[in-house]
């Protein structure tokens, strides 16, 4: 049996038909579905390019193909290309056996309309919370208030009608978007943590020189609150704390965030690495840091934080989404509160005993998200969808 999986990620396609990404969704990510299915077809936005940029990784390959949707960004482009998008999604539903919708997202919503007409069972992978996505400060859009009302309502309906639901959180997203009666439900993060992702032991050394903070996240939106972090670092520097900050990530807000950093007038205190396209490069940056900070306004379960924990890195985060499932209350701050974050940074970076304790706890916690630990839960989820789809197809014959 084959499976089609929708995703809101963007991909690039070269004239030879190969599909590329700079993000997490390269070929190994999609092969996880082969634990229960014979092949995978990814339904996603695809842009045609002449050659792949340096560092991009291949997405399609043996048993993993693409059903491309015309690339669009934002509501205006979506409406302009709606006819082509509807045609592509309708074709995907007609030509497949099983369906997995990675939600929230417009493609998942579009597919759900087709599935409702046919009665075909489907599964959802809930990877984020649209209520937080459209919170004040997280996104700038004239229809933000409408989408903050409509999008959670739509996601609740999708989850209520599914035959199987997998959430990236243990309980945070489940409380707001519960599965329907009789649905199979589980939790499993998207993170990929092979043995090479883990260090062997917690950190015991104290920082030599400036305490080095690190942020890893997309700058396509301000969901991860890099602006709040820069303001907090500025507060710390003005109070005489000897720290620096490295930001890993890129996107449309990068220039704005860089300007905010320059406005601090502490030359060299904030450095930008851009997007790092290999896990090894990200791990190298994490290993040079003393404290990982992710003060997100919006979050499902942050893969970047789990990856930092696997390197035994002490972590601070906000109270949103699934972050409280990863780190204790004493390491959390309210979202959007730069003064509170500055106080927490000072509190932690000046306490080597606490940092050593955080390091050991985080490394142990990351072990719960290793590839070996998550594989069995994913397989049970896929197998349930396959069984339900096979039963539906049998009734249709």
Residue ranges and their predicted role:
Residues 364, 371-397:
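C-terminal alpha-helical cap of glycosyltransferases
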């Amino acid at each position: 049996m084959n499976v089609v999986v929708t995703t809101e990620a963007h991909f690039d396609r070269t004239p030879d038909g190969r599909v590329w990404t700079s993000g997490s969704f390269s070929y190994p990510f999609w092969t996880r579905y082969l634990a229960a299915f014979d092949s995978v077809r990814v339904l996603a936005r695809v842009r045609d390019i002449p050659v792949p940029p340096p560092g991009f990784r291949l997405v399609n390959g043996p048993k993993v193909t693409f059903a491309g949707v015309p690339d669009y960004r934002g509501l205006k482009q979506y409406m302009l290309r709606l006819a082509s998008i509807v045609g592509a999604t309708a074709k995907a539903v007609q030509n497949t056996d099983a369906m997995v919708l990675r939600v929230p997202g417009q493609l998942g919503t579009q597919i759900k309309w087709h599935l409702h007409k046919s009665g075909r069972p489907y599964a959802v992978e809930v990877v984020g919370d649209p209520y937080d996505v459209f919170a004040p400060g997280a996104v700038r859009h004239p229809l933000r208030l409408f989408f903050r009302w409509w999008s959670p309502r739509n996601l609740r309906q999708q989850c209520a009608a599914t035959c199987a639901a997998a959430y990236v959180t243990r309980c945070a997203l489940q409380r707001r978007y519960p599965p329907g009666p009789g649905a199979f439900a589980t939790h499993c993060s998207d993170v990929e943590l092979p043995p090479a992702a883990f260090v062997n032991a917690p950190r015991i050394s104290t920082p030599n020189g400036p305490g080095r903070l690190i942020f890893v996240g997309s700058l396509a939106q301000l969901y991860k609150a890099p602006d709040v972090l820069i303001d907090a670092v500025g507060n710390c520097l003005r109070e005489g704390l000897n720290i620096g900050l490295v930001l890993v990530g890129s996107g449309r807000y990068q220039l704005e965030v860089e300007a905010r950093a320059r406005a601090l007038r502490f030359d060299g205190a904030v450095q930008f690495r851009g997007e790092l396209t290999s896990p090894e490069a990200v791990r190298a940056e994490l290993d040079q840091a003393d404290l990982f900070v992710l003060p997100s306004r919006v979050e499902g379960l942050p893969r970047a934080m789990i990856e930092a924990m696997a390197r035994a890195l002490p972590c601070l985060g906000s109270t949103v989404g699934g972050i409280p499932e990863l780190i204790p209350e004493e390491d959390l701050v309210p979202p959007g509160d730069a003064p509170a974050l500055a106080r927490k940074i000072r509190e932690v970076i000046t306490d080597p005993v606490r940092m050593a304790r955080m390091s050991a706890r985080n490394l142990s916690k990351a072990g719960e998200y290793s590839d070996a630990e998550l594989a069995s839960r994913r397989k049970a989820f896929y197998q349930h969808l396959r069984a339900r789809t096979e039963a539906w197809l049998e009734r249709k014959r």
